[in-house]
Amino acid sequence: MLGLAGRCSAAAASAARPALRRAAGPSHGFLPLLLSRGAGPAAAVGARRDHAAQAAPAAKAGSATGRIVAVIGAVVDVQFDEGLPPILNALEVQGRETRLVLEVAQHLGENTVRTIAMDGTEGLVRGQKVLDSGAPIRIPVGPETLGRIMNVIGEPIDERGPITTKQFAAIHAEAPEFVEMSVEQKILVTGIKVVDLLAPYAKGGKIGLFGGAGVGKTVLIMELINNVAKAHGGYSVFAGVGERTREGNDLYHEMIESGVINLKDATSKVALVYGQMNEPPGARARVALTGLTVAEYFRDQEGQDVLLFIDNIFRFTQAGSEVSALLGRIPSAVGYQPTLATDMGTMQERITTTRKGSITSVQAIYVPADDLTDPAPATTFAHLDATTVLSRAIAELGIYPAVDPLDSTSRIMDPNIVGPEHYDVARGVQKILQDYKSLQDIIAILGMDELSEEDKLTVARARKIQRFLSQPFQVAEVFTGHMGKLVPLKETIKGFKQILAGEYDHLPEQAFYMVGPIEEAVAKAEKLAEEHA
């Protein structure tokens, strides 16, 4: 027993420093920094963030040389004779054809550090030389990163040559000070009816897309990139964290087709950072930080309003759990890392609006077994300004986007922000849907005939509203067969207000399915009437 206790306390002690490491930088690792194309080298924002973007330094390469003493999967122990590298420093393995970066996670004593590899450790041998870079992982940033795909350490992976920038930034940075933050509240119009009406997104806010496997998180993110990034006209950063490589490839080619990425000149609007499912846990645990670092450059150096898309933030937590286990930390609830809240908080606090610019973040959040009380999604909830919950029950009805209108919430659903008309229509829609939900048990047992006339009218309008909340997406045209629609907020409010007022009680409910504005539903009803005539 004493031996076990001793080992546990030793493990806890060795975990203390890495925990501090995580607190120091929300995203750890080498993530390619994707930057905006506007200005030349900009002045640093302040002494606190001076290290974040500077002209490429001749890093203190060779400040210390160590040798590998152990390799356990993605964990590599390195011993130094002198000049022990601090926590979070990047080390580089010598004598390899491909670059392998290690990030210092723990100091073990006897001049040995335990590191996490950012790539596969195949072929490593004991005694191999390792060089301390003298700094955390640094990635290229600046206009040259737009239209390019990078990995976690900033290497281009799109086979289009090197990224020729003089700007580099460390992926670990502090969150902005309170005095730098802005409290302005504005709606970010997405053109998606159910989102804009019932759970509007705040400009400069954090939005979570919750859903189980296969209910449409990635498609919704792609539609948001399509709608918001184009209309918004600024720069976007997409961080692919632990998701399917095929989807990342599809997204890249769709962006080229839609003109968001231009291969011929420097007019691309988006930078891509990928650390997909096949990457080691170290890369997946840091790639979100790489993407965030790119977005921070746009915000702090160029004063841009940046859109940051992360697909999937759960994989960031999952990779952190794998790394934690490899480092020998005692797991917490449901097997997650004991530093779960710290890891999440240090990253999320960097995503904010300052007086110079904003980062509006849309994060897809996989919900294991559709259980919203799982520690990973539950920890994320606390940081969000709006939640869009995707429901399997709604997807089974064939209604897409499968957004749950009663579970989805927004901090800015306030009459003082969205206006009284929008607020009243949204609450009216939610009330009639809730009434319909409470009547469904009666309908299932007794049938529609047993309802009062008032309840029958409620059910009819609710079913029309439910179908009108569906919408054809531009990015899904290929497999839905419906032309995608982007609906302005005024049109959305007008349409639902008229349905609530009973102006379309005479139209069949199927006329409201997969249409854009209300005029299309009326036209579809006329077409249906002609077909049945």
Swiss-Prot record:
Keyword annotations from UniProtKB, A to Z: ATP synthesis, ATP-binding, CF(1), Hydrogen ion transport, Ion transport, Magnesium, Membrane, Metal-binding, Mitochondrion, Mitochondrion inner membrane, Nucleotide-binding, Transit peptide, Translocase, Transport
Record-linked CDD domains: ATP-synt_F1_beta_C (cd18110), ATP-synt_F1_beta_N (cd18115), F1-ATPase_beta_CD (cd01133)
Binding positions (ATP): 214, 216-219, 244
Catalytic activity: ATP + H2O + 4 H(+)(in) = ADP + phosphate + 5 H(+)(out)
Enzyme Commission designation: 7.1.2.2
One BP annotation, GO: angiogenesis
Amino-acid positions noted as binding Mg(2+) 2 in the UniProt annotation, renumbered to this chain: 243
Residues that hold phosphate according to the record: 214-218
Gene3D superfamilies noted in UniProt: 2.40.10.170, Bovine Mitochondrial F1-atpase, Atp Synthase Beta Chain, Chain D, domain 3, P-loop containing nucleotide triphosphate hydrolases
Keyword Electron transport tagged: no
PANTHER family: ATP SYNTHASE (PTHR15184), ATP SYNTHASE SUBUNIT BETA, MITOCHONDRIAL (PTHR15184:SF71)
NCBIfam families: atpD
The protein's name: ATP synthase F(1) complex catalytic subunit beta, mitochondrial
Organism the protein comes from: Gallus gallus
